[in-house]
Amino acid sequence: MQNAKLMLTCLAFAGLAALAGCSFPGVYKIDIQQGNVVTQDMIDQLRPGMTRRQVRFIMGNPLIVDTFHANRWDYLYSIQPGGGRRQQERVSLFFNDSDQLAGLNGDFMPGVSRDEAILGKEGSTTVTQPADQQKPEAQKEEPPKPGSTLEQLQREVDEAQPVPVPTPEPLDPSPQ
């Protein structure tokens, strides 16, 4: 009896230890995105002096247009990955009295895009081939050998005559 209890206790602890690395499947949580998606490329297209219409074409409709500050447009974007922390980005565009873009403020600034920041100073990659693998200069095209299929096809193409496009006859306007 004592041996059976000890054996059951050991098996229970071994089973619990084996299940310690397992977990119950969690509920799937979707990514929650809200607001206007604003990219660095969109910000880089903005120039001082652009009209509201041009800015709206590039950026889309602003999320917030303040009634008391009509010369300010706010673009907000937030994303919360399923089960993760919420990240928020904000850009405010300011217009002067003549409805032209005067400045911007926020998490994005004109300059290096995120891709370029990840890749380094330059976003472009230069590939050079070793001298022995470089492509030879363009070879001059040799005429096809007489009697070859290529020569026969070339002759048929050269001898092709244009054919006039047929025009449909007008419909009879008189009723029957």
From Swiss-Prot:
Q: Per its record, what are the GO molecular function terms? A: protein-macromolecule adaptor activity
Q: Which Gene3D superfamilies match?
A: 3.30.1450.10
**InterPro entries membership:** BamE, BamE-like, BamE_dom
Protein keywords: Cell outer membrane, Lipoprotein, Membrane, Palmitate, Signal
- Ranges of Polar residues compositional bias? 123-132
Positions with biased composition (Basic and acidic residues): 134-144
> Which one GO biological process term can you cite for this protein?
Gram-negative-bacterium-type cell outer membrane assembly
Q: Which GO terms describe its cellular component?
A: Bam protein complex
Give the signal peptide range.
Answer: 1-21
Highest taxon in the source lineage: Bacteria
* Membrane topology of the entry: Lipid-anchor
Say yes or no: keyword Lipoprotein present.
yes
Q: Where in the cell is it found?
A: Cell outer membrane
Where the protein is mainly located, per its record? Answer: membrane
Residue span of region Disordered: 121-176
Sites of S-diacylglycerol cysteine lipid attachment are: 22
Instruction: Please list the residue ranges that the record marks as compositionally biased, kind Pro residues.
Output: 163-176
Name the residues where the record annotates lipidation as N-palmitoyl cysteine: 22
Mind telling me which Pfam families this protein's record contains? BamE
PANTHER family linked:
OUTER MEMBRANE PROTEIN ASSEMBLY FACTOR BAME
Subunit structure of this chain's protein: Part of the Bam complex.
Q: What does this protein do?
A: Part of the outer membrane protein assembly complex, which is involved in assembly and insertion of beta-barrel proteins into the outer membrane. May have a structural role in maintaining the cell envelope integrity.
Sequence similarity = Belongs to the BamE family.
Q: Which HAMAP family does its entry note?
A: OM_assembly_BamE
Full protein name = Outer membrane protein assembly factor BamE
Q: Whose protein is this, by species?
A: Pseudomonas aeruginosa (strain ATCC 15692 / DSM 22644 / CIP 104116 / JCM 14847 / LMG 12228 / 1C / PRS 101 / PAO1)
Gene responsible for this protein: bamE
